[in-house]
A protein has these predicted regions:
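Short, solvent-exposed coil/turn segments
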Residues: 6, 25, 74, 237-239, ...
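Conserved SAM-binding loop
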Residues: 45, 60-165, 281-285
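Short, charged/polar micro-motifs that form catalytic or ligand-binding hotspots
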Residues: 3, 122-133, 238-243, 270
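N-terminal module-boundary/linker segments of secreted carbohydrate-active enzymes
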Residues: 47-59
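Charge-rich, low-complexity intrinsically disordered regions
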Residues: 1-50
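N-terminal/domain-start segments enriched in small and hydrophobic, helix-friendly residues
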Residues: 53-54, 119-121, 195
Length: 287
């Protein structure tokens, strides 16, 4: 894997505003930290998902997790993992009013990631990692599939700019608790957070400071959350288990690496751009 650009690239940041042109590198970095980051100014090319995807070499052996009807990468070196077959994905897309031809023609691996026995230069997922009931085991499984030096390319929702805004950030303790429990389904807490505490999902409104009205129907929402939790053995209910911002994600991954739970380290981490509800990261297998 090529060396990713830094979190703050002074040249990229200076190019966003002629008023910044005279700043040297140190001053540009300081200015971004003091002003640009909170405004969502792009300070690195890989802050944008399209550039993150372009950074993955076309000749790299790649596994994309959860493509559904919009695979991010296509080509002879790309394989897909999903919980549904290609035919099931097309049927689901049709029911949702989505063109089924947008789905991949073939899903190479149907079910869990643990079934895969080959290795890859890169693994890619978008808005997937936050759904994993056991984050540590997921990262361990991805690490197992990566060749030494390979990268896990991630597009992750930033909880500040999506419907998770009012839900507290995830903690290291919570991540390790899930690992110790070998959690495979979402908890009652995750159900309550999703059905009771979520708000609108318009990132521009969130960037402007409009996070929605105070939730007034919590009683009915809570009753619904309990009902959905009771049905969890009948069908899989998909909610977020984890709520990240770039600093929180960095701290959790770094600590998991430090204590030996994973062999992945952060090779690149990029703050969200204005109007978007996601940030990008690259984890690299170190051994």
């Amino acid at each position: 894997m090529r060396t990713p650009p830094p979190t703050i690239d002074p040249a990229t940041y200076r190019a966003t505003d002629p008023a910044l042109a005279a700043l040297d590198d140190a001053a540009a970095i300081a200015h971004y930290r003091a002003h640009g980051r909170q405004k969502g100014v792009v300070a690195s090319p890989l802050a944008l998902r399209e550039n993150l995807l372009a950074f993955i070499d076309d000749d790299a052996a790649l596994l994309e997790i959860g493509p559904f009807f919009r695979p991010l990468k296509r080509g002879p070196n790309v394989e897909y993992l999903d919980v549904l077959t290609a035919e099931q994905l097309r049927e689901r897309a049709t029911k949702l009013g989505i063109d089924p031809n947008r789905c991949p023609p073939h899903i190479h691996h149907v079910g869990g990631i643990e079934q895969i026995e080959r290795s890859y230069d890169a693994v890619l997922s978008a808005h997937v990692i936050e759904h994993q009931p056991d984050l540590v085991t997921h990262l361990q499984q991805v690490e197992r599939l990566l060749k030494p030096g390979g990268g896990y390319f991630l597009i992750i929702p930033d909880k500040r700019y999506c419907f998770d805004h009012f839900i507290p950030e995830s903690s290291l303790a919570g991540v390790i608790q899930a690992y110790e429990e070998r959690r495979t389904t979402h908890t009652l807490a995750s159900m309550i957070e999703h059905f009771v505490l979520t708000t609108h999902n318009d990132p521009e409104r969130h960037w402007r400071g409009d996070h929605g009205r105070e939730i007034r129907d919590r009683r009915e929402r809570l009753k619904f959350a309990y009902a959905e939790y009771a049905r969890r053995r009948e069908r899989y209910i998909d909610v977020h288990s984890w709520y990240f911002t770039p600093p929180v994600f960095r701290a959790i991954v770094a600590t998991l690496k430090d204590v030996g739970l994973i062999g992945l380290e952060i090779a690149g981490l990029y703050h969200p751009a204005y109007g978007r509800n996601e940030f990008c990261a690259i984890l690299q297998r170190t051994t």
